[in-house]
Swiss-Prot record:
The keyword Mitochondrion does not apply. Component of the ESCRT-I complex, a regulator of vesicular trafficking process. Required for the sorting of endocytic ubiquitinated cargos into multivesicular bodies. May be involved in cell growth and differentiation. Its main location: membrane. It is a peripheral membrane protein. One of its GO terms (biological process) is ubiquitin-dependent protein catabolic process via the multivesicular body sorting pathway. It comes from Homo sapiens. Residues 50-170 are annotated as: Interaction with IST1. Residues 262-279 have a biased composition (Pro residues). It is found in: Late endosome membrane. Keywords: Endosome, Membrane, Methylation, Protein transport, Transport. This is Vacuolar protein sorting-associated protein 37B.
Amino acid sequence: MAGAGSEARFAGLSLVQLNELLEDEGQLTEMVQKMEETQNVQLNKEMTLASNRSLAEGNLLYQPQLDTLKARLTQKYQELQVLFEAYQIKKTKLDRQSSSASLETLLALLQAEGAKIEEDTENMAEKFLDGELPLDSFIDVYQSKRKLAHMRRVKIEKLQEMVLKGQRLPQALAPLPPRLPELAPTAPLPYPAPEASGPPAVAPRRIPPPPPPVPAGRLATPFTAAMSSGQAVPYPGLQCPPLPPRVGLPTQQGFSSQFVSPYPPPLPQRPPPRLPPHQPGFILQ
């Protein structure tokens, strides 16, 4: 609407009037300020300035709280530096003690301290039962000492587990025993071929060991007497019968006498009767 009115206003002016309007800056500024777009921009600017002012005033209200928090942060940072320095000192001391003491030593010291605090709490309980300590002081001191005793007991158990694990570790990493050398397979004994002819060779009999000496005061047994008298013969000599001859082999020699059977010779038997030749078609009964 404003743009259309300005165009209609400029359309009714002559060229000379337009040139004069261009040269008159005050009139141009007044015309621009009267435009609707310029008025809207000015209104938005004023509203934005008012909003920023209110926000700035609200932020200024937080200035004391911000200063307090800054001072607190500075104080906490200084405390952190102090604690960090104390941590470094304790860590250095702990490393020095850990390098000079073993787990077993620490466990023994901790067990001694645990036994001491247990004894102190028991003595305090006995004094309270005897009426030597008031109730208020007994509750405060006894509770703190029992808490300390419980913490030491837990530390002792954890340290015992660490010691046990430290003792089992070398056993788990112990070298394995050396393996026994494997025996080389023995060569098979040579056996005679099955095609070999002739009787098997007789192996000589092993001589039995001599009998133990008979102590004094005891009679010798017949076996001991026979063995000590001469050559050890475990059984009397007998004349053995000759081996029966084999087909295709000569009779073995070397026996002094022929074997005589103690039984009479068998009676001669009659030959079986002769049967007629077999005829086809008949069954013999």
